[in-house]
A protein has these predicted regions:
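Short coil-to-helix segment of the ABC ATPase nucleotide-binding domain corresponding to the Q-loop/switch region
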Residues: 94-101
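The feature captures the beta-strand-to-loop junction immediately N-terminal to the Walker
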Residues: 39-41
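Conserved ABC ATPase "signature" region
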Residues: 70, 105-108, 112-130
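Helix-to-loop junction immediately C-terminal to a conserved catalytic motif
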Residues: 54
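Conserved coupling/switch loops of ABC nucleotide-binding domains, chiefly the family-specific signature
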Residues: 60-63, 97, 113
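Conserved ABC transporter NBD signature motif
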Residues: 62-70
Length: 130
């Protein structure tokens, strides 16, 4: 994938809370077309890193670029980033389909495209039919 454009670049990112480094020197490039999963044990900094990507936290050191743009001055609602919370549903009163479609609807994605993309995503993880 290295011949594809970098859509996310994390360079020497550190996030400290007092004397504790929740994230310590992360370097990562994600290229267009890649599928990426962030896995690790509890307390290793996964959620902190995701919160920085989404704009809810800021790096103590280093930089995060999305599509080549430094994110430090981009508010969360203007970032092309979605975050899945550590719960089975963002909104428990909504169906699985509605939860998956939520971000696309907020982004005003055309209804037919929402339906297709949600169905594809659910099929990918064997949840089609929900």
């Amino acid at each position: 994938m290295a011949n594809q454009p970098v859509i996310l670049q994390i360079k020497q990112v550190v996030k400290s809370f007092g004397n504790v480094h929740a994230v310590n020197g992360v370097n990562l490039n994600i290229y267009e077309g890649e599928f990426f999963a962030l896995l690790g044990p509890s307390g290793c900094g996964k959620t902190t890193l995701l919160r920085m990507l989404a704009g809810f936290e800021f790096p103590s050191e280093g930089s995060i670029k999305i599509d080549g743009k430094e994110t430090r001055d981009i508010p969360p609602n203007q970032r092309p980033v979605n975050m899945v919370f550590q719960s089975y549903a963002v909104f428990p009163h909504m169906t699985v389909f509605e939860n998956v479609a939520y971000g696309l609807k907020v982004a005003k994605t055309p209804r037919a495209e929402v339906r297709e993309r949600v169905q594809d995503a659910l099929a990918l993880v064997k949840l089609d039919g929900y």
